[in-house]
């Protein structure tokens, strides 16, 4: 059955209250949202051995985006590549300037490949800057003696990320 408008309103208020409580209990990580970078590159697809974003990655994007974009495919691919290059340049500049990096990853293929790809981009720079790796646990205890499993960091609400900071380890 379809919920009534009163039931919908009640559910929305409950969700908002749960969100408020979650933020009140969140462990701050410091920094700003602009300090967080995402490399949306579908790195679990195709060869990831290129340095930076090369022709192989461009071809993967063309194949993947051709499903959605027909008329302006080349424009969409170039726009995506430029955004990724800008992001990578920013991360490298900050890394070279001595800012620590924290890479959040899991066994999700895109996240795991992304972690390896980014480490490969940073390795030749030979900086002494610390890189921390934070792996999402495969299993964890939930409320009321339950076990939960999350597949990727996208399943973790932003207010919960600080709970995992104790899992960070220095990269070799």
Predicted regions and their residues:
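A short alpha->loop->secondary-structure connector
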Residues: 26, 33, 117-131
